[in-house]
Regions:
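Hot-dog-fold acyl-thioester-processing enzymes
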Residues: 2-81, 144-164
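HotDog/MaoC-like acyl-thioester-processing domains
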Residues: 3-14, 95-164
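Short, conserved secondary-structure segments in the cores of folded domains
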Residues: 8, 54, 84, 89-90, ...
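Well-ordered beta-strand positions in beta-sheet-rich domains
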Residues: 19-21, 87, 132-136
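Short, basic and Ser/Thr-rich N-terminal targeting/leader segments
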Residues: 82-84, 116
Length: 164
């Protein structure tokens, strides 16, 4: 049985980092649209998106925030982390087929409330920044090693979006 392990405030070191790489698919874009309710045609409609400044469908900017959130909650610090704030600057569009490497790096620790400040970034397959920012979390003080939950199964069905 697979487990997850956190890093407690005392274990975390300045400069410590965690990263994950994700390849963007049309299914990812559709799933994010469903979960967020953001059905802007720039994300879902090829014909509409072709007429935008990006010349095609783009991933939702906040998808980057969601992946950064997963790094914080699963890897560094991991289970038991309390997410306090996040700032993000979107540097360039992310399109289907892009491979984005997200990284969080500890830059500051505040002993009084067990606060950890992390630089956050996402870089595409060409080494170009797509997102930059900072996260502030309250790190766990107790060691946790929970069983890793199974990834949920999801089925996508295309449904016409009707404006009211």
């Amino acid at each position: 049985m697979a487990t997850m392990e956190n890093r407690t405030f005392d274990e975390i070191a300045i400069g410590e980092s965690a990263e994950v790489t994700r390849e963007v698919t049309r299914a990812d874009i559709s799933l994010f649209a469903v979960v967020s309710g953001d059905v802007n045609p720039a994300h879902l409609d090829d014909a509409y998106a072709a007429g935008t400044r990006f010349k095609g469908v783009i991933m939702h900017g906040m998808w980057s925030g969601a992946i950064i959130s997963s790094l914080l909650g699963v890897h560094l610090p991991g289970p038991g982390t309390i997410y306090l704030s996040q700032s993000l600057a979107f540097k360039r569009p992310v399109t289907p087929g892009d491979r984005i490497t997200f990284k969080v790096t500890v830059k500051e620790k505040r002993e009084d409330k067990k606060i950890v400040v992390l630089d956050c970034s996402g870089v595409n397959q060409d080494g170009k920044a797509v997102v930059e920012g900072e996260a502030v979390v309250m790190a766990p003080t107790e060691k946790l090693v929970p069983v890793a939950p199974a990834e949920p199964a999801v089925t996508i069905e295309t449904v016409a979006y009707v404006r009211k």
